[in-house]
Amino acid sequence: MASDRFIRKSVEGNDWKNSVVMYLHDLLYMLMAMLLVFLLFFRVIVVSGDSMYSTLLDGDYLLLLGNLFYQEPEHGDIVVISKKTFDNGKPIVKRVIATEGQKVSIDFENGIVYVDDVPLEEPYINSLTKLDEGTKFPLTVEENCIFVLGDNRGVSLDSRNPMIGQIDKREILGKAIFLLIPGTSHGDLPQDMGRIGVIK
């Protein structure tokens, strides 16, 4: 009788251990699957500089929808670009202003951007578009390309500059969709956790 009780306790103990092992095994596989999905669909980058101020600040951590699933940029999208001919391919963050086939012109005297001869309403910009960086306007966006500008038009290096110019879609790393961790403007402002959320 005593030996039967001992055997039952051993079996029950082993069942409990087996359950824990199976649970940890399943949890590990689930975490690996989630990591794989994350790596396929998303990327995380850090904003460097003030060209998107005040929409995005220096040091902001952004979640990107990767270019594997982000195929068709649209006006207003905030995208991350790696252009090998500019700053050794370091990622830069800009806003899509026009897509292939659209005509872009800029009235630098009044700071107004036109797409297909229609003035853009740009509530997101920090300053008017008065800085002429050398690109000739008007221009038509080439096939499989986009035209981008930074929201902080007074300091941004973007498609106005011939060094950057129009962006080939293959140079897009992804679309910024979520602000994960807020940075500061010039390192002198406290983090504003209220900025965490969907990027517009």
For each of these PLM feature ranges, what is it?
Residues 1-91, 169-200:
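Protein maturation boundaries and topogenic segments
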Residues 51-55, 67-72, 95, 111, ...:
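Short, surface-exposed secondary-structure edge patches
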Residues 94-105:
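RNA pseudouridine synthases
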Residues 114-117:
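Short strand-turn-strand beta-turns centered on an Asx-Gly dipeptide
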Residues 60, 74-78, 102, 145, ...:
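Structural motif
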Residues 67, 84, 109, 151-152:
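Short, surface-exposed secondary-structure boundary micro-motifs
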Residues 134-174, 179-182:
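Soluble extracytoplasmic domains of inner/organellar membrane proteins
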